[in-house]
């Protein structure tokens, strides 16, 4: 899968921009741009750009091909988990909805047409290992999101069972905050909270087993869900990508340390060496950090989905 032109920001005249996130640009698709046989309903065009964020700040330098690789990983998992949970993808090709004059090759592998859903206003996080903000919370309180954990656990230790730890859904530039399940219930209601929790853990267990067969540990992951007009629950946005998940090479896993991961760790490590306040604007990245990060995304895509990047 050759990587095409780098895309930092998508501009599609005739498609109203609904949201520009840290990585994805989301456009409403007017009815007259849809194929005549499209089922009734509202649809979105979701574009994965090559933007990179770290510490909740979008950095000025993109990672070439990152959006295509993220989209490929997401699509792989959406199709792989259809038996577990419906997803937001629909059977409408990207080139069918693009405005005239836009090169479809630029968007073919980095964009998808999706159902327009009502987002559940909580990030759904599954954790199988004690790392990241979960490790920090455990050190401080012995708990993660109100869940009591055994004493004496070490950094990166596998948890007795995967746990569901929701968080707030922050705006671009703000920080998500871990919340307990009771707080989620107050936000979305008990019935929906339980459906999201059950789906999150069910998908995590399936994906963790699949990744383990390929020599990769899925330490944790974050999902987003949405509902349609009839209250049906769908998984949406991105799925099990290196941006939303912490993947570790199993052969480099060592208890008590933070294992290397298939993500933007090279970027985070570099930024930690700078005198930077972790607020916008972010600093420029050296070419070697960009290339090493791109290679990590490409390796994750190849090992998980069997798709090679030239």
Curated annotation (Swiss-Prot):
Query: What protein name is recorded for this chain?
Result: Phosphoribosylaminoimidazole-succinocarboxamide synthase
PANTHER family from the UniProt entry = PHOSPHORIBOSYLAMINOIMIDAZOLE-SUCCINOCARBOXAMIDE SYNTHASE
Which family is this protein grouped under? Belongs to the SAICAR synthetase family.
Q: Which gene encodes it?
A: purC
Q: What pathway or pathways are given for this protein in its record?
A: Purine metabolism; IMP biosynthesis via de novo pathway; 5-amino-1-(5-phospho-D-ribosyl)imidazole-4-carboxamide from 5-amino-1-(5-phospho-D-ribosyl)imidazole-4-carboxylate: step 1/2
Taxon lineage: Bacteria, Pseudomonadati, Pseudomonadota, Gammaproteobacteria, Lysobacterales
Molecular function in Gene Ontology: ATP binding; phosphoribosylaminoimidazolesuccinocarboxamide synthase activity
What GO biological process terms are annotated to this protein in UniProt? 'de novo' IMP biosynthetic process
Alphabetic keyword roster:
ATP-binding, Ligase, Nucleotide-binding, Purine biosynthesis
EC number(s) per entry: 6.3.2.6
């Amino acid at each position: 899968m050759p990587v095409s032109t780098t895309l930092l920001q998508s501009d599609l005249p005739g498609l109203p921009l609904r949201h520009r996130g840290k990585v994805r640009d989301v456009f409403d698709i007017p009815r007259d741009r849809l194929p005549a046989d499209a089922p009734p309903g509202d649809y979105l065009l979701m574009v994965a750009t090559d933007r990179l964020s770290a510490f909740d700040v979008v950095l000025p330098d993109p990672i070439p091909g990152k959006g295509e690789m993220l989209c490929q990983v997401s699509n792989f998992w959406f199709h792989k988990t259809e038996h577990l949970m419906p997803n937001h993808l629909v059977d409408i090709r990207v080139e069918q909805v693009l405005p005239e004059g836009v090169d479809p090759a630029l968007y073919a592998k980095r964009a998808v047409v999706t159902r327009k859903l009502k987002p559940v206003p909580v990030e759904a996080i599954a954790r199988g290992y004690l790392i990241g903000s979960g490790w920090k919370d455990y050190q401080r309180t012995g708990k993660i999101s109100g869940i009591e954990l055994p004493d004496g656990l070490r950094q990166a230790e596998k948890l007795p069972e995967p746990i569901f730890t929701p968080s707030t859904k922050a705006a671009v530039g703000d920080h998500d905050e871990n919340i307990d399940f009771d707080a989620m219930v107050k936000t979305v209601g008990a019935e929906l909270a339980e459906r999201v929790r059950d789906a999150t853990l069910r998908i995590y267990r399936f994906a963790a087993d699949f990744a383990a067969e390929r020599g990769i540990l899925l330490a944790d992951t974050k999902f987003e869900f949405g509902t349609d007009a009839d209250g049906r629950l769908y998984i949406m946005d991105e799925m099990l990508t290196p941006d939303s998940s912490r993947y570790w090479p199993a052969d480099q896993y060592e208890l008590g340390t933070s294992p290397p991961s298939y993500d933007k760790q090279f970027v985070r490590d570099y930024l930690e060496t700078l005198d930077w306040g972790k607020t916008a604007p972010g600093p420029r990245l050296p070419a070697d950090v960009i290339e090493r990060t791109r290679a990590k995304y490409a390796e994750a895509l190849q090992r998980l989905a069997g798709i090679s990047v030239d």
